[in-house]
Amino acid sequence: MIVVTGGAGFIGSNIVKALNAQGRTDILVVDNLKNGKKFINIADCDIADYLDKEDFQSRIFAEEGLPDIDCVFHEGACSATTEWDGKYMMDNNYEYSKDLLNYCLNRKIPFLYASSAAVYGDGPTFIEERQYEKPLNVYGYSKFQFDQYVRRILPLAESQVAGFRYFNVYGPREQHKGDMASVAFKLHNQVLAGEKLKLFGAYDGYEAGMQTRDFVFIEDVVNVNLWFMENPEQSGIFNLGPAAAEPFKHIADAVIDFHGQGEIEYIPFPDRLKGAYQSFTQADNTRLRDAGYDKPFHTVSEGVQKYLRWLSDNPRVLDFTKK
């Protein structure tokens, strides 16, 4: 059995779908469907079982009631960078992750988990080393603390433990994320609504629309996760991004190019994000390449075109957008 926590979420559901494409249906999805609209992400997937997150946790504590597990993809987390309830964040992203990791270590189950580029704060260097890690928000801190916990354990681990610092992921099955959905998704919806495409104006030394991120298409994220499952001798903490940062304006340009229409409107940078916003990110993926992963990453133009084609072919998912 393969366990995917957060399996009805953005990255988790894409992993489930990719496992199905490999012929795997012996999948246990763990999630919290309080936001019931997330179900659409796994409606076209084949799984063996579903467990609520709290039920799954109780079975971990009891050390019973779970099947034999081949691998765990731990994608379940509170991923809202604007959430400032530190207790909630640490309970979900740190304590829960520790419990699951130790369950896996005790049974020598490969454990692949979601970290985040948010651990680096405002950079400007994005290398998997302590001196570059300065999170700007409690979400980034929760991910950083778990990475630190993993670092202490890795030398003694007798089974695979691999964490992936996701940079700016976009792609299918993210419509439930509301404000945390990607810029590509938001701009697509603005075009459909006949609105101008809104980007932040000048801020932090960057011209309007030129704040820059290492955008990574969901297919690439899934490919890396599955590669590590197939290479269980590889452990560590790895940046997961193309190492090719592009400005937000390139996203807008790709959306306009796909639709054949649209106009950019620059809006004032919001006060609530000042001091807690990454204006530039770019993965150094040397460790990922050194581990042996050699597939190319999608460019923004390539990824956005694929994504918007998927949205156009699956218009029903917009009915499940979180308001």
UniProtKB/Swiss-Prot annotation:
Q: For this protein, what does the record note about how its cofactor is bound?
A: Binds 1 NADP(+) per subunit.
State the UniProt keywords alphabetically: Carbohydrate metabolism, Isomerase, NADP
Its UniProt pathway annotation is: Nucleotide-sugar biosynthesis; ADP-L-glycero-beta-D-manno-heptose biosynthesis; ADP-L-glycero-beta-D-manno-heptose from D-glycero-beta-D-manno-heptose 7-phosphate: step 4/4
Keyword Isomerase among record annotations? yes
SUPFAM superfamilies given in the database record: NAD(P)-binding Rossmann-fold domains
E.C. number: 5.1.3.20
The intrachain disulfides are: none
Cofactor names? NADP(+)
Q: Tell me the GO BP annotations in alphabetical order.
A: ADP-L-glycero-beta-D-manno-heptose biosynthetic process; carbohydrate metabolic process
Report residues binding NADP(+).
Answer: 10-11, 31-32, 38, 53, 75-79, 92, 143, 169, 177
Q: What is the enzyme's main class? A: isomerase
Q: Which GO terms describe its molecular function?
A: ADP-glyceromanno-heptose 6-epimerase activity; NADP binding
What InterPro entries would the database entry show?
Answer: Epimerase_deHydtase, Heptose_epim, NAD(P)-bd_dom_sf
Query: What is this enzyme's catalytic activity, as reactions?
Result: ADP-D-glycero-beta-D-manno-heptose = ADP-L-glycero-beta-D-manno-heptose
Amino-acid positions noted as binding substrate in the UniProt annotation, renumbered to this chain: 168, 179, 186, 200-203, 213, 277
Q: From the UniProt annotation, give the residues forming the signal peptide.
A: none
Know anything about its domains from the record?
Contains a large N-terminal NADP-binding domain, and a smaller C-terminal substrate-binding domain.
State the protein's purpose. Answer: Catalyzes the interconversion between ADP-D-glycero-beta-D-manno-heptose and ADP-L-glycero-beta-D-manno-heptose via an epimerization at carbon 6 of the heptose.
* Entry similarity comment: Belongs to the NAD(P)-dependent epimerase/dehydratase family. HldD subfamily.
Assembly mode: Homopentamer.
**Protein name (database record):** ADP-L-glycero-D-manno-heptose-6-epimerase
Could you tell me which species this protein originates from? Answer: Hydrogenovibrio crunogenus (strain DSM 25203 / XCL-2)
